[in-house]
Amino acid sequence: MSVRLVLAKGREKSLLRRHPWVFSGAVARMEGKASLGETIDIVDHQGKWLARGAYSPASQIRARVWTFDPSESIDIAFFSRRLQQAQKWRDWLAQKDGLDSYRLIAGESDGLPGITIDRFGNFLVLQLLSAGAEYQRAALISALQTLYPECAIYDRSDVAVRKKEGMELTQGLVTGELPPALLPIEEHGMKLLVDIQHGHKTGYYLDQRDSRLATRRYVENKRVLNCFSYTGGFAVSALMGGCSQVVSVDTSQEALDIARQNVELNKLDLSKAEFVRDDVFKLLRTYRDRGEKFDVIVMDPPKFVENKSQLMGACRGYKDINMLAIQLLNEGGILLTFSCSGLMTSDLFQKIIADAAIDAGRDVQFIEQFRQAADHPVIATYPEGLYLKGFACRVM
């Protein structure tokens, strides 16, 4: 008999709506013993089968659902089916947009909770973020090797969230050849260098692909400030859009060096690109105090909030940084501002920008809204999958 997680009475509603998480407060008891990440059956208080998922005793998310089909086993064939289903959508996108790199698996939204896989050319970069994903590592890798024999697999599960599930951080080559120090990829006519081994996340922010392209419509003959620039994707796109100057700001000299290489790789005018190593908050105040002005500002900060207790402080941070940006914009200037914090809703983020404009003494018009690129889908039963939101704002 399989190990069963029994829900408290009335706590089955989210599963009946096919939400993939079971929180610790919904659990009445365990019937049998399960190891970290092991597959268990989830039943209601009367013993009715609801789902099959991965057990995580150390996490507030006590179980993550693999399947709502009682006949489906969690094995190599299961992962092969999920991967093939996800690949169909990415094949269409890759052909339509001319992509050689994309998110192959977007966790829960692709039916594989706790699993992120990005493809960069012939390299698959893997992040296993939950106990269940780690428990199924061998089955997943076997499925990947069968479906993608041409690809090397590199593990970037060096993510702090694993500690919440009682797991160590892991990183390194799984199969195939080691990725080069900087791997060139293509995106909307740009060539970009990706550091798979040491870069942020899996090496590059594929989720901002469409936003980088959209930037081009606003920048012709404009002076652009690119905040939290990382390796310069927005900067290269701005130069391709015909900007007169782009100033990229980041605290990482390594990232700025790659940004410079990306400008050179695309044979763009390096004299129009400036790279500044500094704290963005500090530099924006310096620019304000000396009367600097820009026509377009890209504000793409890292995640400010990891849990609900940090949300209030994050709101203040987003408000302050957007207020400073609005103060630096010329009349009619464009602010492209983003939040990748899942707990920050689009409505709340829009309110924060409106409040920032009031504090800056300026009016703003919301003229365009952004979200993560289409290779980062959001399944309807898991709205938490929509984490990236952004706005184009015209400053009056």
Curated annotation (Swiss-Prot):
It is an enzyme of class 2 (transferase). Its EC number is 2.1.1.191. One of its GO terms (molecular function) is rRNA (cytosine) methyltransferase activity. Its main location: cytoplasm. SMART domains: PUA (SM00359). Residues 2-81 form the PUA domain. Keywords: Cytoplasm, Methyltransferase, RNA-binding, rRNA processing, S-adenosyl-L-methionine, Transferase. Pfam families: Methyltrans_SAM (PF10672), PUA_3 (PF17785). InterPro entries: PUA, PUA-like_sf, PUA_sf, RLMI, RlmI-like_PUA, SAM-dep_methyl-trfase, SAM-dependent_MTases_sf. It catalyses: cytidine(1962) in 23S rRNA + S-adenosyl-L-methionine = 5-methylcytidine(1962) in 23S rRNA + S-adenosyl-L-homocysteine + H(+). It is found in: Cytoplasm. One of its GO terms (cellular component) is cytoplasm. Belongs to the methyltransferase superfamily. RlmI family. Specifically methylates the cytosine at position 1962 (m5C1962) of 23S rRNA. This is Ribosomal RNA large subunit methyltransferase I.
